[in-house]
A protein has these predicted regions:
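Structured mid-to-C-terminal alpha-helical surface segments
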Residues: 1-31, 36-46, 57, 72-275
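Glycine-rich beta-strand-to-loop/alpha-helix junction loops that act as flexible
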Residues: 49-52
Length: 275
């Protein structure tokens, strides 16, 4: 379906291959979702975080599929469904029809629920025109706190602000995932790619927020030295071939991964700046 705004957003991407085109459609749709959430006032009580946030607002050179949000404070009565209509309206403005459904976590398998708390609600945004594309939205309604946020600007599909975790707190969330995430009995290479990005860009790690995540998710009161040991063990023992294979469909330049080895990542860990 032709739409000037939507087509303009897609035109910024390299669409030569089917994988590239699929990644680009994902990302354009994610930005439209953010615009809808802004219009509905969602960011007055919540913030965007994790890989897709890093991709859209900080130029991470890999594509990301899911969208993760955290409330600014615990709210057991939080109802995300009131934001369905603003999202639907945002897509209507760019000529797209969408359907949003809350997922029943009782039906989740071990893979899907491995890193999902009881206090996280999950929603799927599905598209009439691109049937194979489904964007998963997770909202943590009882989040680990001690994080900071900032407002970040996007200009398409129109000018709007998104409340995001600051980089040190995004880094904290990623380091927690890298060390603790159990995912399909293997590692999630995208976590490793993002870890490399944070170190390369000299982003300091907010250990206070990281410790808060360890306490809430894993019931661990952890010191910095203990976390460093866990990180080193994870980095030195993982199957690097598996790590590379998992992230490959999401990166533009596969040669970036040539240097990857266990020793490479252990050395990166030694370069982490603590805030």
């Amino acid at each position: 379906m032709k739409n000037e705004i939507y087509d303009s957003m897609l035109s910024r991407y390299d669409l030569k291959t089917e994988q590239n085109k699929r990644n680009a459609i994902f990302e354009v749709n994610q930005q439209v979702i953010l615009a809808g959430l802004y219009s509905g006032g969602f960011f007055e009580s919540a913030a965007f975080y994790d890989g897709t946030c890093l991709r859209i607002f900080h130029g991470l050179q890999r594509f990301s599929e899911d969208m993760d949000f955290s409330l600014l404070a615990q709210d057991d009565a939080f109802d995300f469904s009131k934001y369905f209509q603003p999202i639907i309206d945002a897509f209507a403005l760019v000529g797209r029809e969408v359907e949003i459904k809350k997922k029943d976590k009782k039906n989740f398998g071990k893979v899907e629920s491995a890193f999902l708390k009881d206090n996280t609600d999950v929603y799927d945004v599905m598209f009439q025109t691109e049937k194979s594309i489904k964007i998963k939205i997770e909202v943590d309604t009882c989040p680990p706190l001690n994080f900071k946020t900032e407002q970040k600007l996007l200009l398409q599909p129109h000018s709007f602000m998104t409340r995001c975790f600051t980089l040190p707190d995004l880094f904290a969330g990623k380091m927690h995932a890298l060390v603790y995430r159990a995912w399909k009995n293997r590692v999630k290479g995208r976590d490793w790619y993002d870890f490399e990005w944070y170190v390369r860009h000299n982003v300091p790690l907010d250990f206070v927020h990281l410790a808060e995540r360890c306490k809430q998710f894993n019931n661990e009161d952890i010191t910095l030295e203990q976390f460093k040991e866990k990180l080193k063990e994870r980095l030195s023992t993982a199957d690097i071939k598996q790590v590379k294979e998992e992230v490959l469909p999401f990166v533009r330049n596969p040669k970036e991964l040539d240097i990857w080895s266990n020793d490479y990542f252990v050395q990166l860990a030694g370069m982490v700046i603590i805030e």
